Amino acid sequence: MGSEMCIRDRDVGIRDRSMLELLYACGLRVSELVGIQLTEVILSDGVIRVTGKGSKTRLVPMGEEAVDWIKKYLVKSRQNILNKQTSKFLFVTNRGGEMTRQAFWYLIKKYALMANIDKPMSPHILRHAFATHLINHGADLRVVQMLLGHSDISTTQIYTHVARERLKKLHQEHHPRG
């Protein structure tokens, strides 16, 4: 029984890391993450088809790291977690059921605690970091809008405030007249 638990713990850990990597790499909403179906993962192209608000779909690139973790999860861990059950969803709970938003929130809190992160942590913080990092590294606002699935550009413009603050700080630190 002990070795079975170790394998199960490892498989659940791989699932959790895959979820975290995908959430950050794609800037997904939690509902989008837990709702991903196997047929929406296109590993050969490194993209996922995401169904967002208003049932609008978009293709989002996953990035190499997320693809690698998803592959690890799909090769063996997912089947071990399912334990002879089936599911159309990419991510499943420890009992083989559909992952819920609440269950994922619990995971985020658990890992933040384990990492001694004493600031409030939520899945939306990773979505916010995704958008902020893209904008800070020069991504076009319209591209970020598409990746986030925002229907209105003004929703995406919130993230430019963070970029402006960063630019102001960098100017003050590095310019002789800053």
Regions found by a protein language model. Name each.
Residues 3-4, 8-178:
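Conserved catalytic core of the tyrosine transesterase superfamily
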